[in-house]
Amino acid sequence: MTLIDLANPTRFLMLTARVLPWLAAATAILLAVGLYQSALAPDDYQQGATVKIMFIHVPNAWLSMFVWGVMSIASLGTLVWRHPLADVAAKAAAPIGAAFTFLALVTGSLWGRPMWGTYWEWDARLTSVLILFLMYLGLIALWRAVDDPSRAARAAAVLTLVGAINLPIIKFSVDWWNTLHQGASVIRMGGPSMDRSFLIPLLVMAVAFSLLFVTLHLAAMRNEILRRRVRSLQMMQASKQAA
């Protein structure tokens, strides 16, 4: 199965119909294992039990940026390579990315209340993630507001690529500015600084949430393809009746 084969919506539907049940099962198993390991992880000597919010917050924060990266690649596919499923992939990913970003903001606020004494600070990292969330909502609104799918796809692709500028700002904001948010402790020069008792559950949860994204994304793409087919049939039927 090549990328050219996957450009065919019918073949894509056939392939994902076989793959999705296995992906869903793997996601459920890894989430269960990750949650179990997270529950057994010890309390931190400074943060206490609050540290366990990290096992939900960090994967969602990672995926909030990763999904926008996926949408940016799909946007290039729309504008440059004219891939038939590129705009489907971008449109299907946006609500999922918005959900991950929302969960990252909420869990970060829940962690910030006992650690910083407030649910919110206009910190560089927090503010840039909030901007990312608003950009997700803006793209979703754009797709719903424009009736012509081709025009909506092109406009959304341009805005997605422009919005990708925010990704390095989010990633390096803790290095560029004096922020309350802690620096990287997993993906960093010199290797992870986190103890294994926290690192292993975190990585399991990160893989589980990544599989969750893949599963939800493929399912959403299938729904979008089928929705467009139904709309096309309805338009054909309406034109026949008008004639």
State where each predicted segment sits.
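Polytopic transmembrane helical bundles with strong interfacial aromatic enrichment
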Residues: M1-A243
